[in-house]
Amino acid sequence: MRRSIKKVAAGLLATMMIGTMLTGCGGGNKKDSGSSKKETSEINIGFSQVGAESDWRVANTKSMKSALTAKNGFKLSFADAQQKQENQTKAVREFITQGVDVIAIAPVTETGWETVLKEAKKADIPVITVDRQIKTSDDSLITAWVGSDFKKEGVKAAEWLIKEKGKEKGDVNIAVLQGTIGSSAEIGRTKGFKEGIKDQKNFKIIASQTGEFTQAKGQEVMESFLKQNKDIDVVVAQNDNMAFGAIDALKAAGKTPGKDVTIISFDAIKAALKKVQSGEINAEFECNPLHGPRVAELAKKIMKGEKVDIPAGTTIFGVTVTDNYDIDIY
């Protein structure tokens, strides 16, 4: 998705760019997925969504539903897992029983999918993973993945923080609000950030706990962090809703978010960008939720028996408080 960003005059930080990956899984040995299926006038697709735990997820669901319409040649069966993997497994089995043409999954966690994916493969139903990834011992169980490079997002966040605070003489105390443990977003952002700061001896992660990608839990965990240690210099929230919760907790504790405590967040939903402009969030890294059109395109290619090997995706931005941009384009 193209972004039009207006820069303020001279002396501002350059916008850091990170890339999404829209790629077929399994390296270069892609199979001609769907080649045994007949092309039909309507593609029956079952989509198992994580839930509605965040504003990003709501936007992702809207994008999928908007793209997978009858007008566009699809019949969509939608299942909300309410953040429970067992609900997703049940939904996928129902899709298999229904005989859908394609299954799309935005998984709660990376692991625990082997059995049900083998069932889908046995039924000759291709599977597309959306946003988060799934780890299996057999790459052929997943036909394609549409999502972001979460590890690179974490690395870029670390690079920004080093640029801002790397030369400080004292310790920089960091609190991390993790997403759902075991999700590829949590794994990638955690790993990327830790690897990015490993050579900064004065950077100390003094607290780290899941906020489950929700605002309420993010606030609860941040309140707990503040009770345990008031000397927190930086909060890294692995999505915007948790950042909002952290901001509320900091304000309640008499601290000024963005000034007393540096806030780094991910997703770049519109409400978060407003907080970048107001100075409450210092750095924001976008993770585009609009995967629907790409999933629709992939599903059509798969049903035609075409190879789905997509090497690159759109360019997205890391924006900071020093940027001036038109929020209404988001």
Task: Please tell me what each predicted stretch does.
Residues 56-70, 74, 153-157, 184-203, ...:
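Short, solvent-exposed amphipathic alpha-helices that sit
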Residues 1-44, 69-70, 118-125, 329-330:
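Short, low-complexity disordered leader/linker segments with a strong preference
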Residues 45, 88, 145-172, 217-219, ...:
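Hydrophobic alpha-helical segments within soluble ligand-binding/sensing domains
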Residues 78-80, 136-162, 208, 278-289:
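Short beta-strand elements at the ligand-binding edges of bilobed clamshell
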Residues 96, 102-122, 193, 207, ...:
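Hydrophobic alpha-helical
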Residues 111, 115-152, 173, 269-277, ...:
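Flexible loop/hinge segments that line or gate small-molecule binding clefts
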Residues 43, 177-181, 185, 196, ...:
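Hinge/cleft segment of the Venus flytrap/periplasmic-binding protein
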Residues 43-71, 76-90, 94, 98-100, ...:
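Extracytoplasmic "Venus flytrap"
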